[in-house]
Regions:
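Basic helix-turn-helix/winged-helix DNA-binding cores
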Residues: 1-60, 69
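Generic N-terminal initiation segments characterized by hydrophobic and/or small/turn-forming residues
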Residues: 7, 25, 55-58, 64, ...
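Proteins with a high burden of low-complexity, intrinsically disordered sequence enriched in S/T/G/P/A and R
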Residues: 13, 31, 38, 63, ...
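Short amphipathic alpha-helical surface micro-motifs
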Residues: 18-19, 33-36, 79-82, 89-91
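Residues in flexible loops and secondary-structure boundaries
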Residues: 20, 45-49, 61, 69, ...
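A short, Lys/Arg-enriched interface patch at domain edges and termini
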Residues: 56-88
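Terminal, intrinsically disordered low-complexity segments enriched in charged/polar
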Residues: 81-164
Length: 164
């Protein structure tokens, strides 16, 4: 089965994820092997098996890429994600959270006032509003896989409803 005819309702394979997120397979593999983020649907279990990622996994990977592009280390990203899981829960990706990073530290702001407060401290920071990343990912998947537009919309809706 070719990539364009793959039934993405089963999940997204590594090549699709790399295209949507804008990373190399090597990065994706490294992030999985080091425990930063692996596929939620299916791990690779030897030669010939494929990882299967959810829509939510792709959203998270897009956030990781943005933080990396801002100069944040994978160690700091991992710490921030663990902290968010502990404080907000596994559905933090659906919350109105803005992640701000100065390249060294990641701050999570849950209100516009917190964002302004962090910015007024005079630090140069890079901000990522997490919730809009859903729409960006959905749009990118629609652009890359137009034959699956309806399936992708359903996947995003299912992911948001399930909190995965």
């Amino acid at each position: 089965m070719t990539e364009s005819t793959t039934d993405i309702t089963l999940g997204f394979r590594s090549p699709q994820v790399c295209k949507v997120v804008g990373i190399t397979y090597r990065q994706l593999d490294y992030w999985d092997r080091t425990g930063l983020l692996g596929p939620s649907l299916q791990e690779a279990s030897g030669s010939g098996t494929q990882r299967l990622y959810t829509f939510q996994d792709i959203v998270t990977l897009r956030v990781v890429k943005r933080l990396k592009d801002a100069g944040t280390s994978l160690h700091k990203i991992r710490q921030a994600f663990d902290q968010l899981e502990a404080e907000v829960g596994s559905n933090w990706r659906e919350q109105d959270i803005t992640l701000l990073s100065d390249g060294t530290t990641i701050y999570a702001a849950t209100s516009p006032e917190e964002v302004v407060d962090l910015l007024q401290k005079g630090q140069g920071v890079f901000g990522i509003a997490v919730r809009p990343v859903h729409d960006e990912v959905r749009g990118e998947i629609h652009r890359l896989y137009p034959d699956h537009a309806e399936e992708v919309s359903d996947l995003g809706t299912i992911a948001e409803a399930a909190g995965t």
